């Protein structure tokens, strides 16, 4: 999908074809790249997208780098294509942050991109392959705020102090959630500098957080875009409305941003999410609402205890034998718990149900 967009519009810079929603998703997707795999230390230095792409290709030409179980490996091909197109190649990457803290139960990563038109794009990474990252996602159901939301706010305010000019903010999955959180909770002076916020299939918030949000005028600049069969993006509460994009995939696989359909410089939109997405959303929502905060915490601890007992740090660490053992263990749970736990585990590993095949 992205290659088609870059092939169509990649020869046009932002003065010839203004920044659009597909550009925003492409740049938010860049946040999934592990920039510690290139020579330039983007935590303290800068590099253009062209330089980053060239360094990556030179250092890893003979390797098959895996992005993890949930992030498509084509993410690295995207960097290569971007590095060779006038639209993206001279954009400057900087202020890379990548933090995993098991004790704090935090997974956070972000990067800032100088667009070259006097504005910056802050890209927040969504949940990656780490088990601690997914536990933080589940913690959102009973804990507010979670560490990555606070870190996203700190990062925005740090960048706003360092850089002059306007900002666009975006992220996919949890990255979209923390982008909205940062924009909504920062001060009015920084909010005035935010041009737009994109939440691409990111989960919503607990009612406590929504009640605290001082979105004000910034709410008019927040756009939430989800695929037809959105599961992740329908979790928890959304105060803002959302737009629905067509996807070439089915079910939970539509969370893969590479499957979203586009026409020229915009997404192909549909009227609403699918009936199956409504059903999954209703099931999960009813289950979440049926428990108090203490019960939710106990449920999350129970679920992730099953995963961490294997010794795995990432979902990719789980081999077939361990996956089958986990499924067997989940089958011993009480009927209602078993249904939700199994659904959650399938979601994490992108294991389709018979209805999705």
Task: Name each model-derived stretch.
Residues 3-120, 124-139, 143-166, 187-357:
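Alpha/beta hydrolase fold serine-hydrolase catalytic domain that processes acyl esters and thioesters
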Residues 179-188:
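Short glycine-enriched nucleophile-adjacent loop
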């Amino acid at each position: 999908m992205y290659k088609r967009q870059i092939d169509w519009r990649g020869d046009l810079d932002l003065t010839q074809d203004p920044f659009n929603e597909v550009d925003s998703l492409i740049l938010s997707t860049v946040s999934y790249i592990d920039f510690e795999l290139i020579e330039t230390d983007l935590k303290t230095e800068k590099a253009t997208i062209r330089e980053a792409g060239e360094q990556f290709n030179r250092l890893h030409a003979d390797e098959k780098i895996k992005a993890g179980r949930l992030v498509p490996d084509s993410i690295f091909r995207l960097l290569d294509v971007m590095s060779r197109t006038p639209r993206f190649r001279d954009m400057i990457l900087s202020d890379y942050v990548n933090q995993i803290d098991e004790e704090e139960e935090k997974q956070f990563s972000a990067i800032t991109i100088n667009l070259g038109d006097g504005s910056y794009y802050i890209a927040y990474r969504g949940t990656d392959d780490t088990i601690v990252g997914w536990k933080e996602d589940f913690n959102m159901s009973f804990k507010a705020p979670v560490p990555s939301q606070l870190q996203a706010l700190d990062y925005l305010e740090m960048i706003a102090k360092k850089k002059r000019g306007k900002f666009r903010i975006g992220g996919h999955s949890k990255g979209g959630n923390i982008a909205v959180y940062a924009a909504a909770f920062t001060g009015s002076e920084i909010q005035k500098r935010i041009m737009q916020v994109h939440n691409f299939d990111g989960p919503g918030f607990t009612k406590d957080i929504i009640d605290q949000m001082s979105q004000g005028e910034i709410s008019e600049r927040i756009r939430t875009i989800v695929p037809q069969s959105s599961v992740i993006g329908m979790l928890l509460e959304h105060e803002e409305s959302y737009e629905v994009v067509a996807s070439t995939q089915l079910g939970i696989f539509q969370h893969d941003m590479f499957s979203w359909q586009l026409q020229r410089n915009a997404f192909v939109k549909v009227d609403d999410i699918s009936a199956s997405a409504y059903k999954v959303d209703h099931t999960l929502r009813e289950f979440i609402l049926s428990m108090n905060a203490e019960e939710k915490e106990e449920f999350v601890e129970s679920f992730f205890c099953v995963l961490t007992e294997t010794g795995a740090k990432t979902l990719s660490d789980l081999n077939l034998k361990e996956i089958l053992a986990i499924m067997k263990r989940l089958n011993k749970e009480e009927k209602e718990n078993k249904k939700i736990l199994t659904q959650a585990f399938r979601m994490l590993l992108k294991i389709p149900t018979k209805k999705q095949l």
